[in-house]
């Protein structure tokens, strides 16, 4: 049987960089990981609660965390930053307070900055959120996958593969359906592959969405 591996972890150090940049003693490492998870969850929850974009897409590509002894630098890569940049100082300040409360670390300085993603639909997280929104609105999963591929083609990618698994269209038996457009060379290490795994809750149950996007070859 074929052994599956996460395409991002497989390419770390070649075409993929770490999203968390910090060092810690082995005995304190788990605390740093938990802290990162709290920061990411807090930001995602805040954006989700305050989102007013009609598409329902949060547009968070990824969140990068850099830590020094007394400073935590958080960079949010957003596809649709209008929401946070409209009332920028107020919203970012509010977000900073929320994160600091969650971490309970008033002795360390927290900086949050926003970077706009030029081609949002080149990022599988943004695309997965779009598909999840369509499925929640009871759009057929095949239509949702087709529309997602069309959006990606506008971003000049070389290939995309989308897989949705679960009780599709409310059927009794769960199954997995996938579609591929272009090339997606998962075995080639120098191929820059963007990947995400996303869970969406629908009225029929939980569906899993996986997206692989072949961006370029280095």
UniProtKB/Swiss-Prot annotation:
Predominant location: plastid
Any single biological process term in GO: translation
Compartment list: Plastid, Chloroplast
Binding partners and assembly: Part of the 30S ribosomal subunit.
Keyword Ribonucleoprotein found: yes
Keywords: Chloroplast, Plastid, Ribonucleoprotein, Ribosomal protein, RNA-binding, rRNA-binding
GO MF: rRNA binding; structural constituent of ribosome
Name of the coding gene: rps3
UniProt xrefs under Pfam families: Ribosomal_S3_C (PF00189)
KH type-2 domain ranges (all copies): 43-118
A cellular-component GO term for this protein: cytosolic small ribosomal subunit
Homology family: Belongs to the universal ribosomal protein uS3 family.
SUPFAM superfamilies: Prokaryotic type KH domain (KH-domain type II), Ribosomal protein S3 C-terminal domain
Cross-referenced CDD domains: KH-II_30S_S3 (cd02412)
Protein name according to UniProt: Small ribosomal subunit protein uS3c
């Amino acid at each position: 049987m074929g052994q599956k591996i996460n395409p991002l972890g497989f390419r770390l150090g070649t075409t993929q960089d770490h999203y968390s940049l910090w060092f810690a003693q082995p005995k304190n490492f788990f605390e740093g990981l938990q802290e990162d998870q709290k920061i990411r969850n807090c930001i995602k929850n805040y954006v989700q609660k305050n989102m007013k974009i009609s598409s329902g897409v949060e547009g968070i590509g990824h969140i990068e965390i850099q830590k020094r002894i007394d400073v935590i630098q958080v960079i949010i890569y957003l596809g649709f930053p209008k929401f946070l940049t409209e009332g920028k100082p107020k919203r970012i300040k509010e977000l900073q307070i929320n994160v600091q409360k969650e971490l309970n670390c008033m002795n360390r300085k927290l900086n949050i900055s926003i970077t706009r993603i030029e081609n949002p639909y080149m990022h599988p997280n943004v695309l997965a959120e779009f598909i999840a929104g369509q499925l929640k609105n009871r759009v057929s999963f095949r239509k949702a996958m087709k529309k997602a591929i069309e959006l990606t083609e506008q971003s000049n990618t070389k290939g995309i593969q989308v897989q949705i698994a679960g009780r599709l269209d409310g059927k009794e038996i769960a199954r997995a359906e996938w579609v591929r457009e272009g090339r997606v060379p998962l075995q080639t290490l120098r191929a820059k592959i963007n990947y995400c795994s996303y869970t969406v809750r629908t009225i029929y149950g939980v569906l899993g969405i996986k997206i692989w996007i072949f961006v370029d070859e280095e």
